[in-house]
Amino acid sequence: MSPMITHQMQPCPYSCVSTCLAMIVGRSARDLIQEMHQPYRDGDLTLRQMLERLGIEYTAFSSLDCPPLADEGVYLCTSPSLNIEGGNHQILIEVTDSGYFVFDPVQGRDERKYYVARGRGEGIPLAIDLGGFVVDAFILRGHLSARRSGEPLAEVAA
C-alpha cells in the first residue's frame, strides 16, 4: 500500500509544523501558514489546538510513552533540527502495510539537510537517515482515508 501523504516543501525556514499539518489535511502549506503560523509562533496557539481546529482525530503521547510505530497511519514527530542549531523540527512518518515513509517538509529547500527513512539516503548528500524522534500525535489511516474521500467523520472530542 502506498502512502496517503503527499510531500510539500515548507516555504520558509520556520514553517515545518504548519506544513506537516497541511500535508495531513491535504491543503496548501501557504494557506495553513496564513491561517495558523503566526499565532503558533507567538505561543497563542498550541499544536493540540491546531489539530482540533482542523478536525483531525488523533492520539496524543507524552514523550515518556515512547510508542512503537506499529499501527498504520501518520505519526506527527519532533526531531532535532538538521539546519537550525539547537532547534527542533516537525516531520511526518507514515506507516503502511509495506513499510514506513518519512515526509520532511524541509526537503527541497536549497542546501537544507532533510530526514529520510533509514537506508534511503545513501549517495544523497543532504539526506540524513532518521534516528531520534519523539511522537507527538498519531492519526489513524482510516481517519485520513475518510477525510480524503469526503466521508462523514466522527465528532472530535475536545
What are the functions of these language-model segments?
Residues 5, 17, 25, 74, ...:
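Extended aliphatic helical segments
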Residues 18, 79, 118-119, 137, ...:
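Generic alpha-helical secondary structure signal
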Residues 1, 70, 134-137:
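Contiguous, function-dense segments enriched for cysteine-driven chemistry
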Residues 3, 114-117, 142, 146:
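Hydrophobic transmembrane signal anchors and adjacent membrane-proximal interface regions, especially
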Residues 2, 15-18, 28, 62-63, ...:
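Generic serine detector
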